Design a protein with these regions (language model features):
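C-terminal segment of N-terminal export signals and the immediately downstream linker at the start
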Residues: 1, 22-48
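A glycine-rich, aromatic-flanked flexible loop/lid motif
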Residues: 16, 257-268, 312-320
Length: 375
């Protein structure tokens, strides 16, 4: 029997999807039998995060967490970070920012949650550097000595950007002047900024921008020469002629970066409350497998988007991505992501954000170190 589902803020779309021939509930339940000898079965479990396409089968009930009745609660990353690190910690399973989690562990001895190697959000970040078109900035090296705006400083996305700017182009954090905006034009999507995203290290020049201006307006008004931001600034999305991307063909730049480094930057991971894991040692594997099954279902959906989707070249894009990055281009598990994880941990320590350089094994629950994607 399929376990009961409750839905918070996310509508179920099972009916329309099932008519298109996607993998059925029966197929997934057969792969993950719900028979469980643990006396606590079925465990009431709340999972929080964003309703990404590759998570949606877990949300709408097509995929089950073995041994659990699962509630999915939609949340914004800043709010989820705050809840996990310094809030009521009611969530048993939550999406979190990878860098904030690492900083809480390294700097605050945080140990209430552990990570499992599921990564709901990952993005190449060359596309996330924006410039004022009139400042003569033509290449990354031109950012030396410039004023760069950011909303916050120590988020995962900004750590990645500073990392590849230093290692790929020789532009170190201390080579520029940082201006932190008092507002963020993308706050409605990201939520409140957690403490771990506002760490300011020693040895850099940093100041607060004009009161009442978000990062987008600072760039438009010329208060800064460039902008590092996880989201597209408002002025860019509105087509302001003076706001451009530093990398005009960011797709080609990011593809080349992956081919050379093998790094596909991770933004978010999944954390589980340790007291719950201690009481139910089988739970990390059940949660991991559910996320993995959901992702596999999305791969199947994507294989048919050339006919069912609206984008005219989706099929070609999907095939090209697989050719460059492999069939499982969004892998879960430690070993498939070790190089990427270690790069971020290195950047955080180099940039003076983390007080100590952490290993992968320190952040992820010991039982999950050998987990690999289901196929």
């Amino acid at each position: 029997m399929v376990s009961r589902r409750r839905f918070l803020k996310v509508g179920a779309a099972t009916g329309s999807v099932m008519t298109l021939g996607w993998p059925s509930v029966a197929k997934i339940v057969a792969a993950e039998s719900l028979n469980d000898s643990n006396a606590s079965y079925p465990l009431e479990l709340t999972v929080a995060g964003y309703p990404f396409d590759h998570v949606r089968p877990l949300i709408d009930g097509r995929v089950q967490v073995k041994g659990c009745n699962t509630t999915f609660q939609q949340g914004k990353i800043g709010d989820l970070n705050t809840h996990v690190f310094s809030g009521p910690q009611e969530l048993e399973v939550s999406e979190v920012g990878l860098s904030p989690f690492m900083l809480a562990y390294a700097n605050e001895d945080f140990s209430d949650y552990s990570l499992i190697p599921v990564f709901p959000l990952r993005l190449f970040r060359h596309k996330s550097i924006f410039i004022h078109a009139d400042r003569g900035i033509k290449r990354p090296e031109d950012l030396k000595g410039r004023r760069i705006g950011t909303p916050g400083y120590s988020s995962t996305s900004l750590t990645w950007i500073r990392g590849f700017m230093q290692h790929e182009y020789g532009v170190k954090p201390e080579d520029v002047e940082w201006i932190v905006s008092t507002l963020d034009s993308s706050a409605k999507d990201a939520g409140k900024v957690s403490k771990q995203e506002s760490i300011v290290p020693k040895g850099i020049s940093i100041s607060v921008g004009p009161e009442g201006k978000d990062e987008s307006q600072m760039l438009v008004d010329g208060d800064v020469d460039a902008l590092f931001h996880a989201a597209e600034p408002k002025a860019f999305t509105e087509g302001h002629p003076g706001i451009k991307r530093l990398f005009t063909d960011s797709r080609a730049t990011e593809r080349d970066y992956f081919k050379r480094t093998g790094i596909f930057p991770i933004m978010h991971a999944v954390a589980m409350r340790n007291d719950v894991v201690d009481a139910h040692p089988w739970l990390p594997e059940s949660v991991f497998n559910a996320y993995s099954h959901a992702k596999q279902m999305q791969y199947e959906v994507m294989r048919m988007q050339w006919i069912f989707g609206m984008l005219p070249w989706f099929g070609q894009e999907f095939e090209e991505t697989r050719a460059v990055m492999g069939d499982n281009f969004w892998p879960y598990g430690i070993e498939a992501n070790r190089k990427t994880l270690e790069a971020l941990f290195q950047y955080s320590y180099e940039q003076g954000l983390a007080k100590k350089r952490l290993s992968v094994e320190q952040l992820f629950h010991p039982s999950t170190l050998d987990f690999t994607d289901v196929s």
